[in-house]
Design a protein with these regions (language model features):
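Basic, amphipathic alpha-helical patches used to engage nucleic acids or provide basic targeting signals
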Residues: 15-19, 46-111
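Solvent-exposed, charged helical/coil patches
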Residues: 1-37, 84, 115
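A short, acidic/glycine-rich surface segment
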Residues: 38-39, 68
């Protein structure tokens, strides 16, 4: 378990209730160990909240949508922090989740299996 900013706990809880469409769609596929591993949603890690986290594989999945277009530096800093903890980060576009879920799941499963 990783330490996290306690102020993020309530925000993460609220995010789970109000997730965007792509997060909800991907969560429907990831929950209940459908890919053979357990994921949690909106997981605080350090000063960040990961969209999805698999403790067993030390894997974060982030969905990047239009709101991420101008956040390259923030995402890079966040990815470096996760890497410093030994956590792998997969970034998936919002568009791919909505339009190509089967290939998204194949790609996630491939990465889960190789970690």
């Amino acid at each position: 378990m990783y330490s996290y900013n306690k102020q993020l706990k309530n925000l993460a809880r609220a995010n789970r209730k109000t997730g965007n469409l792509s997060e909800v769609l991907l969560w429907q596929e990831l929950q209940h160990c459908k890919l053979g591993v357990r994921f949690t949603r909106q997981k605080p890690i350090g000063n960040y909240i990961a969209d999805f986290y698999c403790c067993e594989k030390k894997l974060v999945i982030e969905i990047d949508g239009w709101s991420h277009d101008n956040k390259y530096e923030y995402d890079q800093e966040r990815d470096e922090y996760m890497k410093s903890l030994g956590i792998h980060v997969l970034r998936i576009s919002d568009k791919d989740v909505k339009q190509d879920m089967n290939n998204v799941l194949v790609w996630i499963k491939h990465n889960v299996d190789k970690i």
